[in-house]
Amino acid sequence: MVSSERSRWALLFADLEAQLAAGEAAEREGAVAELTRAEQAAVRWTDRLRATRGPVRVELSDGEVLEGRVAHLADTWMQLDAGGTRGRVQHVVPVAVVAGIVGLGSQALASQARTDRLGLGTALRALQRDRARVQVRTTSGQVVGRIARVGADHLDVVEVDRARPVDRVVPFSALLRVSEA
């Protein structure tokens, strides 16, 4: 009788140990899941875009879709190298007008380069210095010309394909993209 009682107690304590181990494992899994969710909550979509090496599909707020590879990503704008009917075309796109992206991986890469902090105006001034012919797409249409001036919150585009050049002011808030023309 003593031996069967010891067996019963051994089984009882073994069961308690198994329950405790299962509870601890569930607690660890819950903690890992919570840490994973907290880590994912801190990831910005631009950091995921920065880590992406392949082609992406960028949907703009007006419904236009651009496809290509990200050549540069700053905090407020990106340079997208896209294939088109005329070959490779480069676009400068404010990140604020991106409505969606297809092709992002799950990896993220935080901004570490000082150039990532350069504003949209800096990128546009580089195009102005080069006297590049650009297509400026806005929320109300598009203009082809050269960037004449870049202010704190706007750019001036001189439409050169007209009998008389027209100087158009485009607020950054209306800008969807600036592309090679």
Regions found by a protein language model. Give the residues of each.
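Short glycine-rich, low-complexity segments
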Residues: M1-E67, A71-V144, A148-A181
